[in-house]
Amino acid sequence: MKKYTFHPQKKPNFGDWQAFIVSRLTIFPHMHYTPYRDLLLKLFPNYLKVRKLPLNGGMTCPNLDGTKGFSGCSYCNNRSFSPVFDQAKVSIQEQLDKFVPRLREKYPNAGILAYLQPYTNTHAPLEHLKGIIDPIIKHEEIAGLAIGTRPDCLEDEKIEYLAEQNKKKPIIVEIGLQTANDLTLAAINRRHTLAEFEDAVKRCQAAGLTVTTHVIVGLPGETMEDFKKTATVVRDLHLAAVKIHPLHIVAGTVMAQDFSAGEIKLLDFEEYCAAVAEMIKIIGTETAIERFSGESPSEMLLAPNWCGERDRIIAKVEELLSRK
């Protein structure tokens, strides 16, 4: 395997994180939110840029394998959002050997943040998790690790293990919430509650882990009040970052069937941007905004056709936030 030499670029010492945020908002008063790159700057101070490297740990989901159910969340098709979906049977070491050099060739000076993305990446016995995570942490080219998971798959022993790894390299635990409305969580077949989410977040934070989440705006039956409640939960839990994206309908899901039957009404572009702007007003600047939208491959996306227009969405949200 070819050896790649890279040179982390040292940035100025900004000192205290909160002071840095204040200074940033002073220099850039138009910024009504904290971009995700600022969180990465805090976690990886030796790099001007950090790039995510999606990896497939070969996991499944308690909502699919019978632990809690077999049908999965009604909106979810992992193939629609994970570029490494087809790597499930490839070992982590093989994936690292294959993908790290490619990313390093493209970004020779960037930090590499490994990202265990598809399914629920703590839904396995601890020893199995160690076999997945240890090689990632030990890899000299990997700066840190982000782990996508559910709140009901974070037992104390797993959190303790992740906390130990966090002493070696930064660990980001991305815990899916989707909405703070328990009735909606039940309706979309999440099979966990808001209380379980809050408990998992607090236990991870108490162990020193960086915790982020992702939420969906526009779930069936929800209104602006629901979106604001979800934003309030994100703010009050002092989460490090949040991904926000509109409900989009992808092939192969229960919601695709309901949408085709005319049973689901999606937010339009203006409604979505207005909701995101109101949520950001509540979330404030302590929590970074990692994503303003989400997208799926065109062959899988049924609606809406604008959800991949990231720049347009950000511009509209910023316009709304700038209004007095």
Residue spans for each PLM region:
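Core AdoMet radical
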Residues: 79-99, 103-126, 141-154, 170-196, ...
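Conserved C-terminal portion of the radical SAM core fold
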Residues: 195-254, 270-293
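Auxiliary Fe-S-binding modules of radical SAM enzymes
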Residues: 28-51, 241, 248-324
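Polybasic, lysine-rich low-complexity intrinsically disordered segments
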Residues: 2-3, 10-12
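Distinct, well-ordered alpha-helical segments
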Residues: 126-133, 155-164, 227
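N-terminal [4Fe-4S]-dependent radical SAM core
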Residues: 21, 27-113
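Acidic (Asp/Glu)-rich catalytic clusters
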Residues: 104, 133-140, 162-170, 205-206
